[in-house]
A protein has these predicted regions:
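Juxtamembrane interface elements at the cytosolic ends of transmembrane helices
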Residues: 1, 16-32, 93-100, 174-190
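Membrane-interface interhelical loops and short amphipathic "cap" helices
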Residues: 1-10, 34, 60-81, 134-157, ...
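Hydrophobic alpha-helical transmembrane segments
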Residues: 80-90, 155-171
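Gly/Pro-rich turn-and-neighbor structural signature
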Residues: 1, 6, 19, 25-58, ...
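Hydrophobic core segments of alpha-helical transmembrane domains in multi-pass membrane proteins
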Residues: 289-297
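Extramembrane terminal tails and long inter-domain/linker segments of multi-pass membrane proteins
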Residues: 141-153, 179-260, 264, 276-283, ...
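Membrane-interfacial catalytic/cofactor-binding modules of polytopic membrane enzymes
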Residues: 40-45, 49-80, 85, 210-241
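Interfacial and helix-entry/exit segments of alpha-helical transmembrane bundles
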Residues: 29-59, 75-78, 83-92, 96-130, ...
Length: 297
């Protein structure tokens, strides 16, 4: 693609790790102070975070231009984006289905079968796509339907095929559970709040009527649905503000903008420093932007 385009993609690949890392710490922090119950939705949520992190780690590796050149159009890239798309999207969707469908249908899905579905999908998914990292590193190209013998691809592709069947069986059983929960009257009633959730929608009947609340609910606490079931909590972490001084904000300053521009100049200078001109004759020197950016920061 050329030096400029390759450097731009490398820089953007590196920058995307910042908001993604914030999201992951947000999810982990949400669970950190709680008492985790390993029901089926939570298992899929944990699986989602794990698979998404693996996909993120293998993605941020490609901000290194030599690594990106090695993995380009290989099965390593296939493994990376499937960990993000299937591990991130499919596991998240199944988590949401197992969590919210009881509120929609009024029936609880079989918990043991749900955990079995998670086990099949988790094992099948990793058996399918994790070997593709190694296949890509030893040279198997993507978008190629066949290959010659003797490259060392056979065993790992057989493992991936077995994993794909296991993953497919898990998905089919899960979809069967979702569909049958609308029609199978033998399933256990869900009740209002089968998960001990704390938000107001779980104070409604399951399934929810054509309207939500017949009267506007009176909210006296942050977790009103929880307190409706268990009473007010005497010991909790919420503290009243000590005074009404408001939020302290820093004074107006140009230094954040100067720092941002300096960081940009430093990053671009380090990317292009000592690079060779496309003609092969000139070595570019970006010492000045690097020094200027360092001083600005």
């Amino acid at each position: 693609m050329g030096v400029v385009a390759t450097s731009a993609f490398a820089l953007l690949t590196m920058l995307i790790a910042i908001p993604t890392g914030v999201k992951i710490f947000n999810w982990i922090g949400t669970m950190w102070g709680g008492r985790i119950r390993f029901d089926t939705p939570m298992l899929f949520a944990l699986g989602f975070i794990t698979m998404f992190m693996i996909g993120g780690f293998t993605g941020i590796m490609h901000s290194s231009v030599p690594i990106d050149a090695q993995h380009q159009d290989s099965y390593f890239v296939v493994a990376h984006f499937h960990y993000v798309l299937i591990g991130g999207a499919l596991f998240g969707l199944f988590c949401g289905f197992y969590f919210w469908l009881p509120k929609m249908t009024g029936r609880m899905m079989n918990e043991k079968l749900g955990k079995f579905v998670f086990t099949l999908m988790f094992l099948g998914f990793n058996l399918t796509f994790f070997p593709m990292h190694y296949l890509g590193m030893i040279g198997q190209p993507r978008r190629t339907h066949t290959y010659n013998e003797g490259h060392g691809f056979e065993t790992w592709n057989q493992i991936a095929t077995i994993g794909a069947f296991i993953l497919g069986v898990g998905i089919v059983i899960g979809i069967y559970q979702f569909v049958s929960s609308f029609f199978n009257k033998k399933l256990k009633p869900a009740g209002k709040n089968p998960w001990d959730a704390r938000t107001l929608e779980w104070a409604l009947s399951s399934p929810v009527k054509e309207y939500n609340f017949a009267r506007t609910p009176i909210i006296k606490a942050r977790d009103q649905a929880w307190e409706n079931n268990y009473g007010p909590r005497e010991n909790h972490s919420e503290k009243e503000p000590l005074d009404d001084h408001g939020v302290h904000m820093p004074d107006r300053s140009w230094w954040p903008l100067v720092t941002a521009l300096g960081l940009f100049g430093l990053a671009m200078g380090m990317l292009f420093h000592r690079t060779i001109d496309p003609s092969g004759e000139l070595v570019r020197d970006y010492t000045v932007p690097i020094l200027a950016g360092s001083v600005a920061i």
